[in-house]
């Protein structure tokens, strides 16, 4: 079911092998692009307690979603905050993993003299309070 839902709502589903195997989300999602190479909405995250919304626009065919299950509190971030187990998420626009081994995937090969570019926009909004 790909309908919007809270991340924590399903992250512990041990009956769903991809979540159980990785102890949470670490998946690449194939985006439904209107046209290859165009910048379009890739993902949206919303925190109802703060009213903060993040929209991600990108020209990439995939989005890697990682939910921090590899964090153990040893890394320290801003203001001395520790990066603990599942204490954050990463949404990374990219090509498909293993693309060089699949002729039907967009190419990720960069040849000598070629230039690689990609465009990603992280846009933030807040609810009117």
Which residues are covered by each model-predicted region?
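Active-site pocket scaffolds in enzymes
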Residues: 1-129
